[in-house]
Amino acid sequence: FWKDVYGVDMSVMTPTVMKEPLVDYVNKDMIMSDSCKILDIDLVTCKKEDVNFSSKYSLKMRYNDRVHGLVAWFDTAFSRLTHPTVLSTSPYRTGTHWKQTVLYLE
């Protein structure tokens, strides 16, 4: 991607961009695959060691193109409330200040 940004070689930016995830709003139309859950945590009962995890996942691509990164978001269910609700940071929902996290691939 960085070798041809609208005809300009921006590859000098690659090390800086790859260093840390980008927290920003992601347009749902930019997502090339189905989504999948990688972790389910009960925040009422979880322990410190529960957040150190690995997860196998599979993504089904909707069309053939180059993948530049992975997009992460979370959904939090407040199911014990009088009126249960879900806070979703998905790019398919109304935006929140939490945004999404982009993990760029080399």
Give, region by region, the residue ranges found by the protein language model.
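Class I SAM-binding transferase module
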Residues: F1-E106
